[in-house]
């Protein structure tokens, strides 16, 4: 019995490592394809956005989470359910703005950066920028326009990885004329 449980853990670890290495290969290829880090950062954000737009359906189906009533509830669902479900981590939520429209997600351990060291000639690269795009894309599909950006990164010598989230506005559904 314990042997099977051990296989499941090993399989999950191998799957996680394969994902990390595959993501690293993707970023490496983007660095070769684009001339500067800013273009790579934009491409990672765009790719993440497209993933988020599709991932939200899977998330809603698998998590049985209902509609969030405010940005604080949304932050809790992102940190405690979504990150746990897809990356196996639970970031902490800190640094709320007084207005309640901004917060930080603190990742003590970012699984995307395992085995990674940024070369000196890529100091402007935001290696995990895909995550910001995923957050923007997924939240847009549930009628929330947000800004997501990295403000700290362990790859750049910071103690933790921090993603700053800012609520911009609620997106209204605009139905085509004649459809309601």
From Swiss-Prot:
- What coarse category fits the chief subcellular location reported for this protein? Golgi
Which tissues does it occur in? Widely expressed. Expressed in lung, heart, liver, spleen, brain and kidney.
Q: Which UniProt keywords apply?
A: Endoplasmic reticulum, ER-Golgi transport, Golgi apparatus, Lipoprotein, Palmitate, Transport
Q: Which InterPro entries match?
A: Bet3, NO_sig/Golgi_transp_ligand-bd, TRAPP_component
Output the GO biological process annotations, alphabetical, semicolon-separated: COPII vesicle coating; endoplasmic reticulum to Golgi vesicle-mediated transport; vesicle coating; vesicle tethering
Q: Where is this protein found?
A: Golgi apparatus, cis-Golgi network; Endoplasmic reticulum
Lipidation sites, kind S-palmitoyl cysteine, are 68
Q: Which GO terms describe its cellular component?
A: cytoplasm; cytosol; endoplasmic reticulum; Golgi membrane; TRAPP complex; TRAPPII protein complex; TRAPPIII protein complex
Query: Which Pfam families is this protein grouped with?
Result: TRAPP
Assembly, per entry: Homodimer. Component of the multisubunit transport protein particle (TRAPP) complex, which includes at least TRAPPC2, TRAPPC2L, TRAPPC3, TRAPPC3L, TRAPPC4, TRAPPC5, TRAPPC8, TRAPPC9, TRAPPC10, TRAPPC11 and TRAPPC12. Heterodimer with TRAPPC6A. The heterodimer TRAPPC3-TRAPPC6A interacts with TRAPPC2L. Heterodimer with TRAPPC6b. The heterodimer TRAPPC6B-TRAPPC3 interacts with TRAPPC1 likely providing a core for TRAPP complex formation.
In the record, the note on similarity to other proteins reads: Belongs to the TRAPP small subunits family. BET3 subfamily.
Q: What does this protein do?
A: May play a role in vesicular transport from endoplasmic reticulum to Golgi.
What is the name attached to this protein's record? Answer: Trafficking protein particle complex subunit 3
Q: Name the source organism.
A: Mus musculus (Mouse)
Question: Species lineage, top-down?
Answer: Eukaryota, Metazoa, Chordata, Craniata, Vertebrata
